[in-house]
C-alpha cells in the first residue's frame, strides 16, 4: 500500500478549484460577487472567446490594501466572517475565502487594485504562484483579468460545452446578479460587443426591460408581501405571458440567486389553475429575511440553501402572488363572471394589421380553418410585439363553421392502407365492444344522425359513433402539418413589420439559427438591441399569427434535441389546440363531408394527442348490450 503523504499546496488548490470553478461562468460569478460584497455600484465584465481566453471584471468598490494582496489569494482567507457565530449570520454573497485562490490555481491572473484614490498595486499570479507585485496607478476599486483558464488542467476543457453555450451561461449569471441588485450598474461585453447594460438606478422594471424586453416589462405586475419573518417584493407576469420552462423564474434571497423547487412550486400555486399545462410564468421574486433563518453553507456554488420556516415562506409567496394577480384583474372572481356582460368576438378586432397581398404562392390554395365567435366567449385583446404569449387559451372559444368543409384541400394524402379494400370486412381488424377501432382502413360511413356531442353513422350492419371535436382536431392537425412540410410555404405580408424583443440569452440563440427557422416559414432578420424583425408570416398561422409565431420560437428555444420532424409535430399540435372547435349541430351535408374527410385523414381513429375519434358497435355488440344472447 502506498504511504500516506500530504498534498502540495498547488495540488490542493487545483482540487479545491474543481469544486468552485467549473467553467468560465463560475469565474464571472465569483468575481462579481466579490465586487458586490465590496460595495461596488459599477461593475463591468468583458470576456473574449467565451471566457476561455480572457475574462476581466472591474469595479469601483472598496479595493484591496497593498499589504493584503498575498492574503487575498490564499485559501480560506476572507474579510467577511471571523467567528463560528458569523457562519450562521452571513449577510454577504461570499464568505469561504476560496474564490481568488481557486481562480489563480487554474489560470493566469492579473489584479490591479486600490483602497483609496492615492495609489494602488498590481500583482500577477499563475497557477497559484505569485510572479509579480508592484505599485501602480489605480482609481479606487479592483480590476481582475483572468487569462487562459484551465491552462494547467487541460482535461477540464473537454467537459466544457460549445462556445455559444458557455457564452449563454455567462449572460445568465450576470442577468441574475443584475436582477438581484438593481441599484448596481452592470455592463457585459463579449469580444467588445455589449450584451447587457443596466443603469443602476434601483429600478427593477427597467432592468427587466434591459434583459427580457420593454414590452414584457411594461406588463409585469407588482408583487408585495410581508410577514413577521419575511418580506417579498418583485414583478411577475400575468397568467397568459408564460414560457415553457422555469428558467425565467428568478428567486433572489437577500440578493443571492438561489434554486429552490418548493419555493418555485409555491409561485406556481399562486397562479392557481390559470396557467396552461407545462407553462411557467416570468417572475423576479426578491425575498428579504434575517440571515439567521438561512444556511448558505450547503453547496460550493451557494445556489442551494436551507431555510428555516420554509412552509411559512411558501404560504406567503402563494398568497402574495394570488393577491397581486387579483389586484391587477388577472384572476376573475366568481361574482364578476356572473355580472360581467359577455362580449362577442370578431377576428377583425384583433390588433394585427395584415397586407392583403400574398407572396410566394407557388402552391395550390391551402385550407385555412374559418372560425366564428362563440357567443359566450369573452374578448381578449392582444397588443403587438408578442407581449402576451398565450392569451388565446385552450378553452374552446371558437366554433368551426360550415365553410371548413368548403375550404378543405381535396389533395389530402390518403391512408397508406387505402388500397387494401379486402381487409375492411375482416372481423379481426376491428375491436368491438365499444373500444377504439384499431383497423388501418375506415369504411365509407353513411351519416344517420347526431347527438350534441357525437355523430352517428353506419356501414352495413355496424354502428359507428364519432366524436365531432376530435375529428375536426385530426383534420386541422393534418392540414397544418402538411403546410409545415411544404417546400413552398405561402407568406402573408405585413403592413407594419413586427419587431420581436427577446432576453439577451434568447436573442443570441435565435440569431445564430435564423436560417434554421426558415424551415418553419419564419424569415426573421436581426434588428439589433436584442430584437428580431418579421416582415411576413406563413398563411397557416392565422388567425392568431402573432401568438403562434412566439409559440414556435418558444418551442425552438427549448428543444432538447435537434429533431425537425418532432418539432413540426409539436407546432402543429399547439396550433390545433389554439384553433379548438366547439361541438355544434351539423346539417346532413356537413356531417357526411366530415366523415369523408376523416376517412382520408392520416389517422381517422385518434387525434394527434391519442384521443379516440370513432367507436364501432357490431350487431353482436348491441345484442349483448340488450342481453339478447342470453
UniProtKB/Swiss-Prot annotation:
<dbReference type="InterPro" id="IPR042120">
    <property type="entry name" value="MutL_C_dimsub"/>
</dbReference>
<dbReference type="InterPro" id="IPR013507">
    <property type="entry name" value="DNA_mismatch_S5_2-like"/>
</dbReference>
<dbReference type="InterPro" id="IPR014790">
    <property type="entry name" value="MutL_C"/>
</dbReference>
<dbReference type="Pfam" id="PF01119">
    <property type="entry name" value="DNA_mis_repair"/>
</dbReference>
<dbReference type="Pfam" id="PF08676">
    <property type="entry name" value="MutL_C"/>
</dbReference>
<dbReference type="InterPro" id="IPR042121">
    <property type="entry name" value="MutL_C_regsub"/>
</dbReference>
<dbReference type="InterPro" id="IPR014721">
    <property type="entry name" value="Ribsml_uS5_D2-typ_fold_subgr"/>
</dbReference>
<dbReference type="InterPro" id="IPR037198">
    <property type="entry name" value="MutL_C_sf"/>
</dbReference>
<comment type="function">
    <text>This protein is involved in the repair of mismatches in DNA. It is required for dam-dependent methyl-directed DNA mismatch repair. May act as a 'molecular matchmaker', a protein that promotes the formation of a stable complex between two or more DNA-binding proteins in an ATP-dependent manner without itself being part of a final effector complex.</text>
</comment>
<dbReference type="Pfam" id="PF13589">
    <property type="entry name" value="HATPase_c_3"/>
</dbReference>
<dbReference type="InterPro" id="IPR014762">
    <property type="entry name" value="DNA_mismatch_repair_CS"/>
</dbReference>
<dbReference type="GO" id="GO:0140664">
    <property type="term" value="F:ATP-dependent DNA damage sensor activity"/>
</dbReference>
<dbReference type="GO" id="GO:0016887">
    <property type="term" value="F:ATP hydrolysis activity"/>
</dbReference>
<dbReference type="InterPro" id="IPR020667">
    <property type="entry name" value="DNA_mismatch_repair_MutL"/>
</dbReference>
<dbReference type="GO" id="GO:0006298">
    <property type="term" value="P:mismatch repair"/>
</dbReference>
<dbReference type="GO" id="GO:0030983">
    <property type="term" value="F:mismatched DNA binding"/>
</dbReference>
<keyword id="KW-0234">DNA repair</keyword>
<dbReference type="InterPro" id="IPR036890">
    <property type="entry name" value="HATPase_C_sf"/>
</dbReference>
<keyword id="KW-0227">DNA damage</keyword>
<dbReference type="InterPro" id="IPR002099">
    <property type="entry name" value="MutL/Mlh/PMS"/>
</dbReference>
<dbReference type="InterPro" id="IPR020568">
    <property type="entry name" value="Ribosomal_Su5_D2-typ_SF"/>
</dbReference>
<protein>
    <recommendedName>
        <fullName>DNA mismatch repair protein MutL</fullName>
    </recommendedName>
</protein>
<dbReference type="GO" id="GO:0005524">
    <property type="term" value="F:ATP binding"/>
</dbReference>
<dbReference type="InterPro" id="IPR038973">
    <property type="entry name" value="MutL/Mlh/Pms-like"/>
</dbReference>
<dbReference type="GO" id="GO:0032300">
    <property type="term" value="C:mismatch repair complex"/>
</dbReference>
<comment type="similarity">
    <text>Belongs to the DNA mismatch repair MutL/HexB family.</text>
</comment>
Amino acid at each position: 500500500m502506498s504511504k500516506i503523504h500530504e498534498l502540495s499546496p498547488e495540488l490542493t488548490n487545483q482540487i479545491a478549484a474543481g469544486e468552485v470553478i467549473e467553467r468560465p461562468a463560475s469565474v464571472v460569478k465569483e468575481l462579481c460577487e466579490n465586487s458586490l460584497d465590496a460595495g461596488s455600484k459599477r461593475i463591468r465584465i468583458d470576456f473574449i472567446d467565451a471566457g476561455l481566453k480572457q475574462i476581466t471584471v472591474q469595479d469601483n468598490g472598496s479595493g484591496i490594501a497593498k499589504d493584503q494582496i498575498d492574503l487575498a489569494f490564499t485559501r480560506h482567507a476572507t474579510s467577511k466572517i471571523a467567528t463560528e457565530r458569523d457562519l450562521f449570520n452571513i449577510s454577504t454573497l461570499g464568505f469561504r475565502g476560496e474564490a481568488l485562490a481557486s481562480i489563480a490555481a487554474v489560470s493566469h491572473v492579473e489584479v490591479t487594485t486600490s483602497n483609496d484614490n492615492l495609489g494602488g498595486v498590481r500583482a500577477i499570479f499563475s497557477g497559484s504562484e505569485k510572479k509579480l507585485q508592484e505599485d501602480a496607478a489605480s482609481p479606487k476599486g479592483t480590476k481582475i483579468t483572468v487569462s487562459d483558464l484551465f491552462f494547467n488542467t487541460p482535461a477540464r476543457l473537454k467537459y466544457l460545452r460549445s462556445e455559444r453555450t458557455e457564452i449563454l451561461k455567462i449572460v445568465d449569471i450576470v442577468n441574475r446578479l443584475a436582477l438581484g441588485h438593481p441599484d448596481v450598474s452592470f455592463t457585459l461585453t463579449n469580444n467588445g460587443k455589449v450584451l447587457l447594460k443596466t443603469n443602476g438606478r434601483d429600478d427593477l422594471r427597467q432592468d427587466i426591460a434591459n434583459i427580457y424586453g420593454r414590452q414584457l416589462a411594461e406588463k409585469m405586475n407588482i408583487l408585495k408581501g410581508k410577514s413577521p419573518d419575511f418580506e417579498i417584493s418583485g414583478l411577475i407576469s400575468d397568467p397568459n405571458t408564460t414560457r415553457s420552462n422555469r428558467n425565467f423564474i428568478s428567486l433572489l434571497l437577500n440578493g443571492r440567486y438561489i434554486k429552490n423547487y418548493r419555493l418555485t412550486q409555491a409561485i406556481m400555486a399562486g397562479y392557481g389553475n390559470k396557467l396552461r399545462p407545462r407553462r411557467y410564468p416570468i417572475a423576479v421574486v426578491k425575498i428579504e429575511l434575517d440571515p439567521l433563518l438561512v444556511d448558505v453553507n450547503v453547496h460550493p456554488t451557494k445556489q442551494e440553501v436551507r431555510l428555516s420556516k420554509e412552509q411559512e415562506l411558501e404560504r406567503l409567496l402563494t398568497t402574495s402572488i394570488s393577491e397581486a394577480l387579483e389586484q391587477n384583474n388577472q384572476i376573475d372572481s366568481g361574482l364578476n363572471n356572473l355580472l360581467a356582460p359577455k362580449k362577442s368576438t370578431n377576428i377583425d378586432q384583433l390588433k394585427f394589421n395584415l397586407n392583403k397581398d400574398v407572396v410566394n404562392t407557388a402552391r395550390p390554395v391551402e385550407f385555412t380553418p374559418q372560425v366564428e365567435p362563440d357567443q359566450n366567449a369573452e374578448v381578449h385583446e392582444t397588443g403587438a410585439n408578442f407581449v402576451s404569449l398565450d392569451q388565446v387559451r385552450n378553452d374552446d372559444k371558437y366554433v368551426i363553421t360550415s365553410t371548413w368543409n368548403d375550404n378543405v384541400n381535396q389533395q389530402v394524402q390518403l391512408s397508406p392502407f387505402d388500397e387494401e379494400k379486402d381487409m375492411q370486412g375482416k372481423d379481426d381488424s376491428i375491436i368491438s365492444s365499444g373500444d377504439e377501432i384499431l383497423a388501418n382502413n375506415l369504411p365509407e360511413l353513411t351519416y344517420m344522425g347526431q347527438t350534441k356531442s357525437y355523430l352517428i353513422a353506419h356501414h352495413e350492419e355496424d354502428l359507428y359513433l364519432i366524436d365531432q371535436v376530435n375529428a375536426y382536431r385530426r383534420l386541422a392537425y393534418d392540414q397544418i402539418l402538411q403546410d409545415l412540410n411544404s417546400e413552398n410555404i405561402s407568406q402573408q405580408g405585413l403592413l407594419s413589420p413586427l419587431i420581436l424583443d427577446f432576453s439577451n440569452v434568447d436573442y443570441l440563440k435565435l440569431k445564430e439559427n435564423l436560417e434554421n427557422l426558415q424551415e418553419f416559414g419564419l424569415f426573421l432578420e436581426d434588428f439589433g438591441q436584442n430584437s428580431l424583425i418579421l416582415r411576413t408570416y406563413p398563411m397557416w398561422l392565422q388567425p392568431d399569427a402573432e401568438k403562434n409565431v412566439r409559440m414556435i420560437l418558444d418551442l425552438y428555444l427549448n428543444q432538447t434535441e435537434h429533431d425537425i420532424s418532432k418539432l413540426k409535430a409539436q407546432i402543429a399540435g399547439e396550433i390545433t389546440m389554439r384553433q379548438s372547435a366547439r361541438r355544434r349541430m351539423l346539417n346532413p351535408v356537413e356531417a357526411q363531408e366530415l366523415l369523408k374527410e376523416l376517412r382520408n385523414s392520416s389517422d381517422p381513429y385518434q387525434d394527434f394527442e391519442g384521443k379516440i375519434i370513432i367507436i364501432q358497435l357490431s350487431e353482436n355488440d348491441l345484442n349483448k348490450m340488450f342481453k339478447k344472447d342470453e
